[in-house]
């Protein structure tokens, strides 16, 4: 025992003891754009948009659909029964089957696209959202099939289709079958165009590769979130290929808007209102709200006590009116 411990009263504790309070994990997070420390509940209330710099953070497909669709209207999932399979028995550094299992456990989804039918501001809509956490949101056979089923649901019911893209491109583990989804989804969008059903495409960070070269850039209206990376090959690959320095902000949403590649940039917090407004302009005022009550019946006007003058007594004015009616009938193309 040291001399200091001998001098201290016995009732005074010499150790700190167990910590009575601890900060829960995940209560604070860091913005990768401005490096600011953010309180997680405040960030969630701000729809995962940094309140300091406005950077839009990546969110899951389910979270995006939950923020976008009306809570009052029950959403019905489309193609949830479809399951991916390793039909090619593909293997690189790891078996494709193992990669699927790992991604399913990490995200809780069975593939990289979630499709639902719901409503936005009481307007019916079919919406798709990519899950970037599932193998980089890559497009395989299940993703292509779910998108096509969602497009067919929209076409059959004459309601708009909205797709939130967040993908690295086609899934290489499915080889040509994944590349075929580019043509398959493009054909589904073509059928929507023939039926004059609106298709709104929202590009989020990142939208690259085969997805950007097919369904993501075929919308009637193309929207992007601020700062989203959009393109086919990445900027680093392009610089190594052309051996030139790319312009500042190349392949970002603002750069694409300035060069006419997209129609508008919309903040995530305004996305619901903006898309609902576009749906009203493109698809008419269709609502799933309850039908209004029937209008009150109006009693017919009482018959006039004075009888109408016979046609013979109408005089020249009546004859002129008959001649005008005959000339209008002759000029009407429906009587040709």
From Swiss-Prot:
Bias (Low complexity) occurs at 312-326
What do the Gene Ontology cellular component annotations say? acetate CoA-transferase complex
Q: From the UniProt record, which GO molecular function terms apply?
A: acetyl-CoA carboxylase activity; ATP binding; carboxyl- or carbamoyltransferase activity; zinc ion binding
* Start and end residues, zinc fingers (C4-type): 31-53
Question: What Pfam families does its record include?
Answer: Carboxyl_trans, Zn_ribbon_ACC
- This protein is called what? Acetyl-coenzyme A carboxylase carboxyl transferase subunit beta
Q: Tell me one GO biological process term.
A: fatty acid biosynthetic process
HAMAP family for the chain: AcetylCoA_CT_beta (MF_01395)
What's the EC number here? 2.1.3.15
Q: Please, which domain of life does this record's source organism belong to?
A: Bacteria
- Bias class Acidic residues marks the residues at 300-311
Cofactor mode of binding and number, as noted: Binds 1 zinc ion per subunit.
Q: How does it assemble?
A: Acetyl-CoA carboxylase is a heterohexamer composed of biotin carboxyl carrier protein (AccB), biotin carboxylase (AccC) and two subunits each of ACCase subunit alpha (AccA) and ACCase subunit beta (AccD).
Q: Which residues bind Zn(2+)?
A: 31, 34, 50, 53
Domain CoA carboxyltransferase N-terminal: where? 27-297
Give its localization. Answer: Cytoplasm
Organism of provenance: Halorhodospira halophila (strain DSM 244 / SL1) (Ectothiorhodospira halophila (strain DSM 244 / SL1))
Q: Cite the entry's keywords alphabetically.
A: ATP-binding, Cytoplasm, Fatty acid biosynthesis, Fatty acid metabolism, Lipid biosynthesis, Lipid metabolism, Metal-binding, Nucleotide-binding, Transferase, Zinc, Zinc-finger
Q: Could you tell me which InterPro entries the record lists for this protein?
A: AcCoA_carboxyl_beta, Acetyl_CoA_COase_Trfase_b_su, ClpP/crotonase-like_dom_sf, COA_CT_N, Znf-ACC
Q: What class of enzyme is it?
A: transferase
